[in-house]
Amino acid sequence: MKKACVHTIQLNNWFPELCDLTLPLIQKWANNIGADFNLISEPKFPGWPANYERFQIWESGAGYEWNINIDADFIINPTLEDVTDNDPSIVRAEAYMHTDVFFYPNQYFLRDGRGISMSDNFILSSWMTHDVWTPLQMSYEEAAKHCIKDSRQVSEFAVSLNIARYGLKCSGAVKDKNKTYHIQSTGCGKSKEDIVELAKAKIKEMGIQ
């Protein structure tokens, strides 16, 4: 198996002004830790939100010891540690959610009982925890009915369902939090111009050359 792959979604040349700032940094970090970089630019799940395309990792990441999913609006300092230096039996993420706040109960959430859900913006998985990328066996319309707040969260529903269904252990992914920053560009209420200026300011603040 290859060591690792970093996967990032950018469909239909999404927000190029921001991605021109963030993607080179993500790619440079991937290179620094000896990982391949996979830009998910072609949809394979028609009718689903763009963020669900991360489940292409189920197939494209099958040949790797580690898979790292990072949203395109994440600023990564290329000097960030190698996050694959971790216990492969644990799925790791940069943000957690309370299951009962975002998703309706089902047999897997109730049986698991932990109430742990993961934000899908930064997820680290290994060959041992690859089940976290199992695509849903239902339509988008059916999946959306499981989401309490926003049907766009079907991606996070799928991740969280797999955590409960397979009993996957969870923890944080990054030790040095000062070397990552999530712009959270979707639904933030800011203009594209303001988002780009925020990204530039954060990159400067983080001392990234």
Annotated model-derived regions:
Residues H7, N38, I68-I70, S89-V91, ...:
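Hydrophobic/aromatic beta-strand patches that form the interior of the parallel beta-sheet core
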Residues M1-Q56, S60-E65, G187-Q209:
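N-terminal anchoring/stem segment of glycosyltransferases
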Residues Y64-I75:
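Short beta-strand-to-loop acidic/aromatic patch adjacent to the donor-nucleotide binding site
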Residues P49-I57, N67, D87-V91, Q107-Y108:
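Active-site regions of enzymes building and remodeling cell-envelope glycoconjugates
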